[in-house]
Amino acid sequence: FLRHVADAALDRLRIAGGGTGGHLYPAIAVARAWMRGGPERRVLFVGTARGIEARVLPREGLPLETISAAGIIGHSIARKGWAAALMVRGIAESIGVIGRFQPHVVLGVGGYASAPAVTAAWLRRRPIVLMEQNVVPGMTNRLLARFAFKVAIALPGAAAHLPPGKIVDTGLPLRGEFTGGPPREASFWEGPLRVLVFGGSQGAHALNEALAEALPLLGEDARRMRFV
């Protein structure tokens, strides 16, 4: 996916969504690859003032425009009505962003901010690509997939939940600081095997519990390992 993005004969990319690191950081990797295509390349993120993007993107030197959006899933009827009103407002704001920035393609990365931004792209007839980082796609990407030209997935299992014929299995885009680093020194491998366990969003608690329950199955091997 990054290779195709970097080689595309396009100049302006708008990235829609965010809210959590799982949505945002792969999008940053795509943005960096896009801009390596030449000095004329421009990228613009669209998110909310409450999401992680409002804190991270200024640090990364990447431009962000904020729109109105709020989550709907798991909230009261009153909250859903309020979120629906924000959705309409966010679509109008996103149409304004499209008019100013004139993107050649819109990339939706998931999260509730993606919904109004991608819907606006569909209304303005802009090519839409979605990026799904999870094995079970979120509600936003499942609903928006019908409008997309392609859906880039990080894990093959996601294809079962998305429209056939649009899937591109690209893997997860990684930022440059996590690839191509120097080889580990020999001392890195000394001592117990160190295992870092972490999950994101809804899977974090379940993953930690599953590991704790599985530790007795390791028997004596567990003494030679350190879990964090």
Regions found by a protein language model. Name each.
Residues 51, 56-60, 183, 187-228:
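Donor-nucleotide binding loops and adjacent catalytic segments primarily
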Residues 74-105:
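An amphipathic, basic-hydrophobic alpha-helix
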Residues 23-35:
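Short amphipathic alpha-helix
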Residues 41, 122-182:
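Active-site-proximal region of nucleotide-activated glycan assembly enzymes
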Residues 12-18, 40-86:
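Conserved nucleotide-sugar phosphate-binding/catalytic loop shared by glycosyltransferases and other
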Residues 93-106, 114-129, 142-147:
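Glycosyltransferases and closely related glycan-assembly transferases
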Residues 38, 97-102, 189-190:
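Glycine-rich phosphate-binding loop signature in dinucleotide/nucleotide-binding domains
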Residues 12, 40-44, 63, 127, ...:
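Residues at the starts of beta-strands that form the adenosine-phosphate
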